[in-house]
């Protein structure tokens, strides 16, 4: 080699070294320039993925999900190995061998930059995609690419490959609000990622490249091409064998949109819990993956929803058929696709599906359903018993021909039912698929009764004509021990109206408010045997604005009446006279102790008849005090809130009944009556009885099942003394046994109690009641304050809903009663005057210092009628409030 050639080579060598040094210095300069602006990779270990707020029942059934991004993070161990192979084949086959950067990919990106002036394909590894998704924008800029490279190198140093892959699996956007592959699997296939097959895994692995372009919903053909390319890559890389490839490559595209499946239909509960979570944590509640665990019991919630819907439908059917919801233009019937689209826009309400009448014959209809089926609705499936609605109190004559009511294009409602034919000589029973209760096949038929003999059922599926009720209702049930809401339904269907009538509809409770006035009287010194005159009374008071002449239902008066009888017969005059004697200020103060707000209570005598506007939740809180022995509890819904890792962020500490704690004062006045001879009273009998021989009751404690749990909670204050609560419990049980709540005798339980309520019109129907297990209020009425119709009372409209729910809720539970306090004795009295007697009469319970005096026996005067002896009354109607109150 010549000297000249050697010098040239040496010069080139030095030039190369200088170039390398310059490049190194340039890269170092870029690194030093960009380094301060790079985020900390360590933060990836504690990264908070945007995860929606989820609401659960107490038994962890999903009730609701709130948030813009659907994400369900999973660990790498929960990710199927074949799916991981599909991701690597699609995105980064050398993931486990490179250091975070692909030189080949970078060279390709650099070539694009030189040729076009922009970076198009990116050349990104999985690590670089993680860096971009967590820290950087998706904009294709040169500086961002350097940041991406530097971050990727740091990530590879700080995290393991599995940790990086787990971040990728959970973070990346995959279309349709789905972030992460677990959420995407649920969106596109309605399954967890572990439950998909190889073809579906390959389809999912194709989404990150372009979630819109390769979306199996928006572009199924392009998504199929991408899937098949990934399957070929998996075969070439040895991830799958030829048989697996052949089977998967021919699989059809099966993706379809799946909304998040809820385990429990409780939208009113979900909305209440959402609001409370936002009140506690602000808007972070929507993104930080909080889990709200409510107090709701899923079984009771389903029973409550079914009971309310069934009760409203039954009430509605009693008042006639209002006709089709709408009539479509005839030309729509010629376009089946447009017809189906229209049907799919009509929401299913209460399980009632919309259908369009396509043909009408005198005794049947042909109906198009939203699933493209055309069914025949025979005369016997709801048509034969139609009586047209005229008003809430009047119906037309029974329909003789379907052509008189229906025409092609009519939109009607249908219920899908299962018909169990139990035998040739027995009637058929219709059981709704959407309702747990037996449902008559013909909802508009007049109720009939008949015995059926058990036989092997033959099950067939049918459709029955129905209609969405116009009346609304609410039901709420709480645990008397601490106020935990176990079930709440705020209306017929949340899709129909988001207005929560259980918590927002303040309506007049009518006679169901009377027990609070009676309790104030018992606490003040009255007894269940105190005599009050049930006679006409007229008031001329300025705060009543006019002359007020309250009446009893039917305009009848009983004269001198014991308080017990006055309550279960719901005598208005007795309630008014009682309140008048107590004084309004005292009564209002006492009633306030049940949790009612003073500002919501009427400041006149009409409060004795339930003229104050209250919500079902407020009413059930008051009745819980009768159920738990006299304590005021506060209803609550959210038991605890967990973060995304399951750590407790919030734990409710409700007021709790605690039998073992020192009892706080009641705040009531001390009674000044002289005690009677207790030894003498013991001879007359112990126990609880309302007109019958004393019977021994099986007593179970009403306090918390876990005493240690209650000790950490604040103690519930008393609303009334234990003695008053016990006496009121006894009197309210008589409402079931002998009064306006007798329909509940069908439950065949002795531990239930409550009170009906009906307001003028009638416009509102109530039943509030309880067992020691649950306190429950049910309300029925119109949002427009319209009248419910003739012969509709609390006992006919609301009580059946309460019975339906409580029968299910208490099924299998033994009877449970309040323990008799030490200060209670049972005494034989003369029912005509409430005095103690030794001859005949009936038994009554008293506080030991309020036992009445003994009467002078007169054999010619002491004759007791069935009415005196509290025998069951045959008048099932209850009182209504006079129009002057409204």
Positions of predicted regions on the chain:
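N-terminal type II signal-anchor transmembrane helix
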Residues: 1-56, 94, 113-114
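Active-site-adjacent helix/loop patches that line small-molecule binding or acyl-intermediate pockets
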Residues: 134, 296, 532-537, 551-596, ...
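Soluble, non-transmembrane domains of envelope/secretory-pathway proteins that act on or interact
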Residues: 1-3, 254, 259-260, 329-337, ...
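A short, well-structured edge-of-sheet supersecondary motif
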Residues: 52-58, 79, 196, 353-370, ...
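Beta-lactamase-like hydrolase cores
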Residues: 32-49, 197, 311-323, 343-352, ...
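Active-site SXXK
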Residues: 87-88, 234, 304, 362, ...
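Short, well-structured active-site flanking segments
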Residues: 96-106, 179-182, 241-244, 453-461, ...
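Non-catalytic, structured segments within soluble enzyme domains
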Residues: 27-28, 32, 118-371, 578, ...
């Amino acid at each position: 080699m010549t000297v000249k050639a050697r010098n040239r080579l040496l010069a080139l060598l030095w030039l190369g070294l200088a170039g390398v040094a310059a490049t190194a210095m340039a890269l170092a300069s870029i690194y030093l320039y960009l380094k301060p602006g790079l985020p900390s990779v360590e933060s990836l270990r504690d990264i908070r993925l945007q995860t929606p707020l989820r609401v659960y029942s107490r038994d962890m059934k999903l009730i609701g999900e709130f948030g813009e991004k659907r994400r369900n993070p999973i660990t790498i161990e929960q990710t199927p190995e074949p799916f991981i192979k599909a991701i690597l084949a699609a995105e980064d086959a050398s993931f486990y061998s490179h250091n975070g950067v692909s030189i080949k990919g970078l060279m390709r990106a650099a070539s694009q930059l030189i040729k076009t002036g922009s970076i198009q394909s990116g050349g990104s590894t999985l690590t670089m995609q993680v860096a971009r998704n967590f820290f950087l924008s998706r904009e294709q800029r040169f500086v961002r690419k350097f940041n991406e490279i530097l971050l990727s190198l740091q990530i590879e140093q700080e995290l393991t490959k599995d940790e990086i892959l787990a971040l990728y699996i959970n973070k990346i956007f995959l279309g349709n609000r789905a972030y992460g592959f677990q959420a995407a699997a649920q969106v596109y296939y309605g399954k967890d990622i572990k439950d998909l097959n190889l073809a579906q895994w390959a389809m999912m692995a194709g989404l990150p490249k372009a979630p819109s372009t390769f979306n199996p919903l928006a572009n199924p053909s392009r998504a199929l091409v991408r899937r098949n390319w990934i399957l070929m890559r998996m075969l070439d890389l040895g991830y799958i064998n030829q048989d697996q490839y052949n089977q998967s490559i021919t699989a059809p595209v099966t993706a379809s949109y799946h909304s998040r499946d809820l385990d429990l239909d409780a939208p009113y509960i979900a909305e209440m819990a959402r609001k409370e979570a936002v009140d506690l944590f602000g808007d972070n509640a929507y993104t930080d993956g909080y889990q709200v665990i409510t107090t709701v019991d899923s079984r009771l919630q389903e029973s409550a929803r079914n009971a309310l819907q069934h009760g409203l439908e039954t009430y509605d059917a009693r008042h006639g058929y209002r006709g089709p919801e709408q009539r479509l233009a005839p030309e729509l019937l010629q376009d089946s696709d447009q017809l189906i689209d229209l049907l799919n826009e009509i929401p299913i309400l209460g399980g009632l599906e919309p259908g369009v009448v396509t043909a009408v014959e005198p005794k049947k209809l042909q109906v198009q359903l939203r699933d493209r089926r055309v069914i025949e609705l025979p005369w016997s499936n709801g048509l034969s018993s139609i009586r047209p609605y005229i008003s809430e109190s009047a119906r037309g004559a029974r329909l003789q021909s379907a052509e008189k009511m229906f025409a092609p294009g009519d939109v009607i409602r249908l219920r899908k039912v299962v018909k169990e034919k139990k035998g040739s000589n027995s009637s058929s029973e219709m059981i709704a698929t959407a309702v747990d209760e037996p449902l008559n096949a013909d909802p508009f038929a007049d109720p009939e009764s008949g015995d059926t003999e058990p036989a092997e059922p033959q099950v067939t599926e049918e459709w029955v004509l129905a209609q969405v009720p116009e009346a609304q209702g609410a039901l709420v049930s709480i645990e008397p021990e601490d106020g935990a809401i176990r079930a709440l339904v705020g209306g017929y269907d949340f899709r129909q109206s988001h207005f929560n009538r259980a918590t927002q509809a303040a309506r007049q409770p009518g006679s169901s408010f009377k027990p609070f006035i009676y309790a104030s009287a018992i606490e003040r010194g009255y007894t269940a045997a105190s005599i009050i005159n049930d006679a006409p009374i007229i008031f001329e008071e300025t705060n009543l604005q006019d002359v007020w002449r309250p009446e009893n239902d039917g305009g009848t008066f009983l004269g001198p009446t014991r308080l017990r009888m006055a309550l279960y017969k719901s005598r208005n005059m007795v309630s008014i006279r009682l309140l008048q004697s107590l004084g309004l200020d005292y009564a209002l103060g006492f009633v306030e102790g049940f949790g009612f707000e003073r500002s919501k209570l009427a400041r006149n005598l009409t409060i004795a008849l339930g003229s104050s506007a209250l919500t079902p939740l407020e009413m059930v809180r008051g009745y819980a005090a009768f159920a738990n022995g006299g304590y005021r509890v506060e209803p609550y819904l959210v038991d605890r809130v967990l973060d995304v890792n399951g750590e407790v962020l919030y734990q409710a500490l409700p007021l709790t009944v605690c039998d073992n704690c020192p009892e706080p004062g009641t705040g009531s006045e001390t009674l000044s009556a002289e005690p009677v001879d207790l030894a003498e009273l013991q001879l007359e009998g112990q126990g609880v009885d309302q007109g019958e021989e004393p019977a021994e009751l099986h007593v179970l404690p009403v306090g918390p099942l876990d005493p240690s749990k209650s000790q950490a909670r604040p103690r519930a204050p008393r609303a009334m003394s234990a003695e008053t609560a016990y006496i009121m419990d006894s009197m309210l049980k008589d409402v079931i046994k002998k009064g306006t709540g007798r329909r509940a005798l069908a439950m065949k339980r002795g531990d239930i109690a409550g009170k009906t309520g009906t307001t003028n019109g009638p416009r509102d129907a109530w039943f509030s009641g309880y067992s020691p297990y649950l306190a429950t209020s049910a309300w029925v009425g119109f949002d427009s304050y319209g009248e419910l119709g003739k012969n509709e009372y609390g006992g006919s409209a609301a009580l059946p809903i309460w019975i339906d729910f409580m029968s299910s809720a208490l099924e299998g539970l033994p009877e449970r009663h309040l323990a008799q306090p030490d200060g209670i004795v049972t005494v034989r009295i003369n029912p005509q005057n409430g005095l103690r007697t030794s001859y005949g009469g009936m038994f009554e319970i008293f506080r030991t210092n309020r036992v009445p005096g003994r009467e002078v026996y007169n054999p010619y005067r002491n004759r007791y009628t069935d009415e005196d002896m509290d025998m069951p009354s045959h008048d099932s109607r209850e009182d209504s409030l006079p129009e002057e109150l409204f």
